[in-house]
Amino acid sequence: MGQQHGARNGLTHRELPRGMGLLLAMALMNVVLYVCLDHLFISPGRATEDPRRCPPGYFRMGRMRNCSRWLSCEELRTEVRQLKLVGEGAVKRVFLSEWNEHKVALSRLTRLEMKEDFLHGLRMLTSLQSQHVVTLAGFCEEDGTILTEYHPLGSLSNLEETLNLSKYRDVNTWQHRLRLAVEYVSIINYLHHSPLGTRVMCDSNDLPKTLSQYLLTSNFSIVANDLDALPLVDHGSRVLVKCGHRELHGDFVAPEQLWPYGEDTPFQDDLMPPYDEKIDIWKIPDVSSFLLGHVEGSDMVRFHLFDIHKACKNQFPAERPTAQNVLDAYQKVFHSLRDTVMSQTKEML
């Protein structure tokens, strides 16, 4: 009897750690799950400056620990090794190149008559360096060259092809896609409140052209890349813009960008009324729809964005929301959906 009583006591002492171990394992599993959910729902919008950002005139990219001064003409000529052509537009050619064991993008002016646009883009790059814009590594006005960080995933127009690859399957979710849409609106908001005043993204007369102005980074963020056409709007001085000198067509561009005098009156650039930054707002729903794609949950996101998108498509520019209004609405939807999913997950545990 004594031996049996002792055995029962011993069994209880041995089972207690097992029970506690099970509880600890469950608690640990919950912690891991919450961490995973927090990682999945990385709060969008990069409102605060990255503490790793360099002071004006300096850059850091890749695994660089310290900031380096923008490369000079001489350094660009002697230290940068051009590898292959990766892109070409009306203003410049872009070459994948190498500098100090870093992959970089070397842009070369292709036609002298486009030098004004080239220099405008360079001024925008130097003045708008931020988390919203591709990192500038150097330039040479004399040679017509600009060196920027290279992003192997390329243009934002490649998003679907990239996310369809098996290695990126885990990020092909409505959560990550909505975060991209928030970042896109963040860039538009930054341009509308930039250090250089209200800037309008004029190279955006159709969806493919608009997407080509942005790069997809390796950590699946968006940065503006092509800044050759960012004219200034100044409402105080009644300065408005016109994107190009040709007649525009289609429903992607804002109504005020269309020729207003009917088909019977031939288009004349000097008769075309100018417009303001609200043309960027009109295009947000179409760009956002592309970014959201057609994955599970994307239609749910579209439903929650319906009201703000309807406001963006107002025929009267003055009645459209500002970029900040749109950004606030996007972030509200993101956080609301995040809280709903996390609440449902907690209830399942």
Curated annotation (Swiss-Prot):
It is a single-pass type II membrane protein. Keywords: ATP-binding, Endoplasmic reticulum, Glycoprotein, Kinase, Membrane, Nucleotide-binding, Signal-anchor, Transferase, Transmembrane, Transmembrane helix. It is an enzyme of class 2 (transferase). One of its GO terms (cellular component) is endoplasmic reticulum membrane. It catalyses: 3-O-[beta-D-GalNAc-(1->3)-beta-D-GlcNAc-(1->4)-alpha-D-Man]-L-Thr-[protein] + ATP = 3-O-[beta-D-GalNAc-(1->3)-beta-D-GlcNAc-(1->4)-(O-6-P-alpha-D-Man)]-Thr-[protein] + ADP + H(+). Glycans are attached at N66, N164, N219. It is found in: Endoplasmic reticulum membrane. Residues 43-349 are lumenal. Its EC number is 2.7.1.183. The chain crosses the membrane at residues 20-42. Pfam families: PK_Tyr_Ser-Thr. Belongs to the protein kinase superfamily. Ser/Thr protein kinase family. STKL subfamily. Protein O-mannose kinase that specifically mediates phosphorylation at the 6-position of an O-mannose of the trisaccharide (N-acetylgalactosamine (GalNAc)-beta-1,3-N-acetylglucosamine (GlcNAc)-beta-1,4-mannose) to generate phosphorylated O-mannosyl trisaccharide (N-acetylgalactosamine-beta-1,3-N-acetylglucosamine-beta-1,4-(phosphate-6-)mannose). Phosphorylated O-mannosyl trisaccharide is a carbohydrate structure present in alpha-dystroglycan (DAG1), which is required for binding laminin G-like domain-containing extracellular proteins with high affinity. This is Protein O-mannose kinase. It comes from Rattus norvegicus.
